[in-house]
Swiss-Prot record:
Domain of life: Eukaryota
Protein name according to UniProt: Cytochrome c biogenesis protein CcsA
Species this chain originates from: Adiantum capillus-veneris (Maidenhair fern)
Protein localization: Plastid, Chloroplast thylakoid membrane
InterPro entries: Cyt_c_assembly (IPR002541), Cyt_c_biogenesis_CcsA (IPR017562), Cyt_c_biogenesis_CcsA/CcmC (IPR045062)
Function text: Required during biogenesis of c-type cytochromes (cytochrome c6 and cytochrome f) at the step of heme attachment.
Family (UniProt): Belongs to the CcmF/CycK/Ccl1/NrfE/CcsA family.
Record's GO cellular component terms: chloroplast thylakoid membrane; plasma membrane
Quaternary structure annotation from Swiss-Prot or TrEMBL: May interact with Ccs1.
Chief location: plastid
Signal sequence coordinates: none
One annotated GO molecular function: heme binding
Gene Ontology annotations of biological process type: cytochrome complex assembly
The keyword Plastid is assigned to this record: yes
Length: 316
């Protein structure tokens, strides 16, 4: 009973903090206020430790890794989003990750706490198939890969919203700015005379900032997806070994296995298109955006069917 009360406190505080951070970042999109970054970082730190406290409390209750049902997995996802937020807080100087990760953590947390029935949120014993030493390696690798892939895809979606319809393929450091520069300097347009020196300078500065945003988004999306792809590969391989031990077959074309393979192939295509690091365009960003929906299909969608070997304890 005492564990239930502690969990309730941790869950509610973390949800309030996620909501507060999301609100602060939305305000910061329109009104750049220095103190907002400080408050949002501290609030996300509180949310991170509260979610960590929930996971530890659930472990003390069940004596197994808190990844045994949908509720625990979703809470682990929100924990991972908050951790990535704090990591990128240090490394991302532009702050693009804040507006992406904070709403993601809040929505996942809200779905887990407000949408799932009480029965699904209650601690449960592991089904026999999950009572294995492979649980930590396979399930944690898959969930962490989902966290990083979702984060990278959200960054790609943000990039696409800035980039779509502007140019088809640009060289990051030069081409985007050069095109705008020559467009402005085209004597047939007489833009210098029409807009004046002040507007001309403002346009160049604005375009330079947009190019910097696109560069940063592309960099973080590629690096995050690369990490997630590696973890997804480890998760699939460890799952195949575990499946052979539990069910006598490395691969059975279970719905979740099939969609995991489809997701892996889509992100493999994305990384293949990013071999030339100087290039970016709509194609890679759209591929990563497609991966965002595939991850959710793989994580939640196939369980709505109520069939398959991975259906235990979820949405059936």
């Amino acid at each position: 009973m005492i564990y239930t009360g502690i969990e309730y406190i941790f869950v509610n505080i973390s949800f309030v903090m996620f909501f507060f951070v999301t609100l602060l970042n939305l305000i910061n999109l329109f009104y750049k206020i220095d103190k907002i970054d400080h408050f949002s970082k501290n609030s996300m730190t509180i949310a991170f430790f509260c979610t960590t406290g929930f996971l530890i409390t659930r472990y003390l209750q069940t004596r197994h890794l808190p990844l045994g049902n949908l509720y625990e997995s979703l809470m682990f996802l929100s924990w991972g989003f908050s951790l990535l937020y704090l990591i990128l807080e240090v490394r991302d100087q532009i702050g693009l990750s804040h507006a992406v990760l904070a709403p993601g953590a809040m929505l996942i947390h809200a779905f887990a706490t407000l949408s799932l029935p009480q029965q699904m949120r209650s601690p449960t014993l592991l089904v026999p198939a999950l009572q294995s030493q492979w649980l930590m390696m396979h399930v944690s690798a898959m969930l962490i890969s989902y966290i990083t892939l979702l984060c990278g895809s959200l960054l790609a979606i943000t990039l696409l919203s800035l980039f779509y319809g502007k140019v088809g393929s640009v060289t990051l450091e030069h081409k985007f700015e050069k095109q705008s520069f020559f467009f402005l300097m085209n004597p047939r347009k007489n833009l210098w005379k029409q807009t004046g020196a002040e507007n001309y300078s403002y346009f160049l500065i604005s375009n330079s900032r947009k190019c910097q945003l696109i560069n940063c988004l592309d960099k973080w999306a590629c690096q995050t997806i690369s990490l997630g792809f590696s973890l997804l590969t480890i998760g699939i391989l460890s799952g195949a070994v575990w499946a052979n031990e539990a069910w006598g077959s490395y691969w059975s074309w279970d719905p979740k296995e099939t969609w995991a393979l489809v997701t892996w192939l889509v992100y493999a295509i994305y990384l293949h298109t990013k071999v030339d690091k100087r290039k970016m365009g709509e194609g890679p960003a759209m591929t990563a955006s497609m991966g965002f929906f595939l991850v959710w299909i793989c994580f939640l969608g196939v369980n709505l069917l109520g069939v398959g070997l991975h259906n235990y304890g979820w949405l059936a």
